[in-house]
Amino acid sequence: MFCTSGRSILSNSIVIFATLSSEPAIVLDRVSRLYGNFAALREVSLSLPAGASVVLLGENGAGKSTLLKIIAGLATPTYGTVSVFGGKPLEQRHRVATMSHATMLYDELTALENLRYFASLHADTALQALSPEQALRDVGLDPALPRRVGDYSQGMRQRASLARVLLTEPDLLLLDEPFSNLDRGSANSMVERLQKYLATPSAEGTRRTLLLTTHQPELARPLASLVLTLREGRIVDREELQLATHNS
């Protein structure tokens, strides 16, 4: 659990200190991202330990998705620096998985065929932790279902996308609106799967770290050890929570 917290001397900074890890999983120092004259992020500074489970709240355009992209190495900051597990984001991408609005699934393939393909991409890197069949079962999908992903409902596509990113059981999981298009039962099942992910240490024995964005905080709260609210590219509020599920 997080034992203490505080604000650093950096502008707009929220820094979380913990005994979970001697080295932070994520460090952002005065990160800004500009698109022309629009500032998607404004001098955001943040330090998170391995094992943190962070829910990002905020209206559309608040900077949530941009923040995830920068941590994932899919976008670069205009100003400031980013460190993931002590290195540059792209250097650590083998330890990170991202689920965004684009599912990254091939419509003409079944879910199992999709996951077998993604598993083959990691065949020589020893990254695959789950079988494609198990990854699908874990999110409530039948691996034997012959239907193409293109014929799936939005909720089924969302679950198949989650199975894809959990296939390697990454050290850092970044989820952008994972509960969108899910009914309450499917959303609760996803929460349970993510709780299992958080409670299972990596092969190296380190705690897994989660950041997710959502417009449905009531669904995400069971996962959260920290809730951050963004507004106009700045972190404006935080709420720290005690998470018994991390000890399960």
Indicate residue ranges for each PLM-predicted region:
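The feature captures the beta-strand-to-loop junction immediately N-terminal to the Walker
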Residues: L57-E59
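Catalytic Walker B motif of ABC-type/P-loop ATPase nucleotide-binding domains
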Residues: L173-D176
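Conserved ABC transporter NBD signature motif
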Residues: G80-Q92
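Conserved ABC ATPase "signature" region
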Residues: R116, S120, A129-A144
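Helix-to-loop junction immediately C-terminal to a conserved catalytic motif
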Residues: A72
